[in-house]
Amino acid sequence: MINLEDILDMCPLTREEVAAIGEHEHVEGVAAATLADYLMHLRKGPQEVNRMICEDIRAALHRDDVEHARKLFAALKHFMATHPEAARGSE
């Protein structure tokens, strides 16, 4: 039987990136991984993931959770390094 770890292993994003999408959309586990995979296959999906993680960082900073914002920033930095098509304005 396929479990969450198997699904995360098939996803093109890291666990931290999937968690950020899940945080943004208020879903966890399989739902977050499925959404992440779906977004990465859309034409502007990587840019949407970029936007979601940026919004999560802003939300963490607004509630003074600097440590969480730091972790999200690290996830964003890795995401942008591995998915340059996610940059705003890229086609």
Name each model-derived stretch.
Residues M1-M52, K71-E91:
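Long, non-catalytic architectural segments outside compact domain cores
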